[in-house]
Amino acid sequence: MPVNLVAPDPASLLPVPGVRLGIASAGIKKAGRRDLTLIELAPGSRVAGVFTQNRFCAAPVTVCREHLTRGDVRALVINTGNANAGTGDEGLDRARRTCSAVADLFAVDATQVLPFSTGVILEPLPIDKILPALPAAHADLAAGHWSEAAAAIMTTDIVAKGASRQLQIDGRTITVTGIAKGSGMIHPNMATMLGFVATDAAIAPALMQRMVRDVADVSFNCVTVDGDTSTNDSFILIATGQAGNAEIADAGTDYSALKAALADVAIELAQAMARDGEGATKFMTIAVEGGRDRAECKQIAYAIARSPLVKTAFFASDPNLGRILAAIGYAGVQDLDVNALKVWLGDVLVAEAGGRAAGYSEAAAAAVMKAAEITVRVSLARGDARATVWTCDFSYDYVKINAEYRT
């Protein structure tokens, strides 16, 4: 079951002026399931995105990248149950045909539509089911359908994921709302995740790509469930500009304030993925400090977070903490002085000076391991940089869920 995670109250997901969402059932994987989502954007909205680094990227990712270079995005279409990945030229054609059908509904050009898919890889996109369902999704468009969309984009997720924040900029109330899906094949850059965060703030087009990368770097690129990088990962930032604030044109105070709110929403969504990791029973925070740069801190944090031996030890509540030291050692950080390291499990000092801490108590460590939320802290003692990664344990259910995924 998810770790300290519940679906958001629909009333807590605030409408974003300039955004409407509609949901319908295409029956892609299961008859009657609401698995098709349309998102309509007001004219003048600005959109930026970051996508999977997997070289075997899905057809919709390729099409999204093409369409984003042309600007003026007016609609998004999202299907679950089929990834449209590993589908070659036919997959590209079906993604583009989907965009054309959506464009007809909105009376825009097909290049103004971004397609997204998530689900099983290597199976043809069932366009014969998707296209007939699009008018129903279009008829369902409403500003308040964030909660319904959060549920519609799920695959193996147990809990829908959404969050909202508000802030003041230039005397105007700015709203930020986001939804995401993902609970397996989660590892940056990025994870099997789709994330959509929208704001009504006005921000210059030249800053949008910087903003989406800044936000992804501290959120969706800091979470791992199983170390697998998906073919379909996409994080989209939308700014409708309808709040009426003076356009944010430089990376000053207003940019920083908006970035903080966007990051706050994105971090909540990213952490929800680890909390909802397939079969998860523990939520783990891996915090590495004292590095020469953030990259090496992140490198060590990920080595710990994705280690199957570390993750299974946490599932068993077994303080077999030598596995953490082993992961640090094989992380690949150059010239690392292991004798300068310190490792804590919660507040329990586990290792220092190259070995077990003098006052270490296995009973104290075992007590920490029984908690549902656990922090591992590592000090490298060679600089001021730091990085944090979120993950979960590996349980029997992780194997069961993935073994039975197609059956």
Swiss-Prot record:
Residue numbers marked as site, Involved in the stabilization of negative charge on the oxyanion by the formation of the oxyanion hole: T118, G119
User: Where does the UniProt annotation locate this protein?
Assistant: Cytoplasm
Q: Which residues are annotated as active site?
A: T192
- Coiled-coil blocks: none
- Which Gene3D superfamilies does the record cross-reference, listed alphabetically? ArgJ beta chain, C-terminal domain, L-amino peptidase D-ALA esterase/amidase
Q: Which keywords has UniProt assigned to this entry?
A: Acyltransferase, Amino-acid biosynthesis, Arginine biosynthesis, Autocatalytic cleavage, Cytoplasm, Multifunctional enzyme, Transferase
Instruction: From the UniProt record, list the reaction(s) this protein catalyses.
Output: N(2)-acetyl-L-ornithine + L-glutamate = N-acetyl-L-glutamate + L-ornithine; L-glutamate + acetyl-CoA = N-acetyl-L-glutamate + CoA + H(+)
- One MF annotation (Gene Ontology) recorded for this entry: L-glutamate N-acetyltransferase activity
Q: Which InterPro entries match?
A: Arg_biosynth_ArgJ (IPR002813), ArgJ-like_dom_sf (IPR016117), ArgJ_beta_C (IPR042195)
Keyword set includes Disulfide bond: no
Site (Cleavage) location in chain: A191, T192
**Biological role stated in the UniProt entry:** Catalyzes two activities which are involved in the cyclic version of arginine biosynthesis: the synthesis of N-acetylglutamate from glutamate and acetyl-CoA as the acetyl donor, and of ornithine by transacetylation between N(2)-acetylornithine and glutamate.
Q: What is this protein called?
A: Arginine biosynthesis bifunctional protein ArgJ
* Organism phylogeny: Bacteria, Pseudomonadati, Pseudomonadota, Betaproteobacteria, Nitrosomonadales
Gene name for this UniProt entry? argJ
